[in-house]
Swiss-Prot record:
Its EC number is 1.5.1.5, 3.5.4.9. PANTHER family: C-1-TETRAHYDROFOLATE SYNTHASE, CYTOPLASMIC, C-1-TETRAHYDROFOLATE SYNTHASE, CYTOPLASMIC-RELATED. This is Bifunctional protein FolD. Pathway: One-carbon metabolism; tetrahydrofolate interconversion. Pfam families: THF_DHG_CYH, THF_DHG_CYH_C. InterPro entries: Aminoacid_DH-like_N_sf, NAD(P)-bd_dom_sf, THF_DH/CycHdrlase, THF_DH/CycHdrlase_cat_dom, THF_DH/CycHdrlase_NAD-bd_dom. Belongs to the tetrahydrofolate dehydrogenase/cyclohydrolase family. Homodimer. It comes from Clostridium botulinum (strain Eklund 17B / Type B). SUPFAM superfamilies: Aminoacid dehydrogenase-like, N-terminal domain, NAD(P)-binding Rossmann-fold domains.
Amino acid sequence: MGQIINGKEVALKIKEEIKTFVEERKKNKLRIPKIASILVGNDGGSIYYMSSQEKVANSLGVDFLKIILEENVTDDDVINEIHKLNDDVNVQGIMLQLPLPKHLNEKKIIKEISVKKDIDCLTFESQGKLYMGEKGFLPCTPNSVITLIKSLKIDITGKEVVVLGRSNIVGKPVAQLLLNENATVTICHSKTKDLKEVCSKADILVVAIGKPKFIDEEYIKENAIVIDVGTSSFEGKITGDVNFDKVIDKASFVTPVPGGVGALTTTLLIKNSCEALKEYED
């Protein structure tokens, strides 16, 4: 039987570092980090993620501002909120919950986030830095994937890695981060032929497609590492893309949902807000 990769345990050390940083600043009467999180509409995964952000931020003494907009807002409505946050010196990080409702122009809206406050690497400039290897904020979910794999103390170099999903939020950036670790990376998507065959050759399988319990044991190589990035509402519960019960006996390591990638992602987001505050003061 495979082992569970506990995102909460991996996050603990980082949380302690954040807590110490915030406490020192409070003690010296210095500004503490503040994150503003924008949610448009009522996407289940986004609501869950925002709630997690708020809970962790509060536990670490980081200020958290929730901005919830109706689903029928316009591009300009969202952009106006972003501009206010760009101009607010007390806000170090802006988090826009994706996906946005389909009638909104996601690229146009994202472009308006200040790169100095883009703590989840959403803007073109931030992503350009990522792909060119320049210093900048790493996208939190992809960084969480890499951090969890590294927590297993395995050498990623030369490993066959399949990333299932090609979104700009997870699939593409996580593939780039894995390439930076010298993995051999294959990206699969809805048009990939013989998907089971491709996935079943992976030493490491990263799944980010938003289809609850889509991946079962037939997609898994014996003793593979399986990282489930999915968070969907399914039968009243938050569920991943991997059918955990069917995969755990075949894989060597699997991340649960909840308690896996998402548990660490939120912590890395807050860590980025601390880094943004340091950059602002420098």
